[in-house]
Amino acid sequence: VEEKEFKGDVFFMGQDFGFNHANVILLLGFYENEIYILKELYVKGLETNEIINLAEDIFEKNVIMWCDSAEPDRIKAWQKAGFRAVGVSKEKNSITAQIDYLMGKKIIINPSCKNTIREIENWCWMKDKNSGEYIDIPTPINDDAMAALRYGIEYVRKI
């Protein structure tokens, strides 16, 4: 976590949809081998239209927003509101590939992104049930910002 001025010009957003779990939107900046987490919206228990209203005060609509493709109706609502929301295609082993990509980057988090900081500090790995060894799959608990981060880097990861 550090306060560091972002000097790049490549931006994407990542969104993990939620209601009981957090709905998270992250604004990401990309520069050389660094990923900047610049802004977050982290809310629970809100309808999509309520989240859109909050997001309109925080994020630019012209930045592509990579979203969980499992929720096409929500993506459509964001598009109708003027956001450039697009579903991320989920491929076999994509979570592992996204995490490998992230591990090769320096991630700089704006101190205002308190929920993202909390999640990344508490991120842990699953254990194999038989051997007890850690495996390369994160524990799916309190990982909403991490999912938004993974969605937000997916396009850049593939180029």
PLM regions and their residue ranges:
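Mg2+-dependent endonuclease catalytic cores in nucleic-acid-processing enzymes, primarily RNase H-like
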Residues: 26, 31-140
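Generic detector of well-ordered alpha-helical packing
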Residues: 17, 69, 144-145
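ATPase catalytic-site recognition across NTP-hydrolyzing enzymes
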Residues: 1-15
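Residue-level detector of short, conserved catalytic/binding motifs and their immediate flanks
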Residues: 23, 63, 146
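Charged alpha-helix within mobile-element recombinases
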Residues: 136-152
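Short acidic, Gly/Ser-rich segments with clustered Asp/Glu that frequently serve as metal-coordination loops
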Residues: 13-23
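Acidic two-metal-ion nuclease catalytic site recognized across multiple nuclease folds
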Residues: 154-159
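Short hydrophobic/aromatic beta-strand or adjacent loop that forms the aromatic wall/cage
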Residues: 22-25, 150
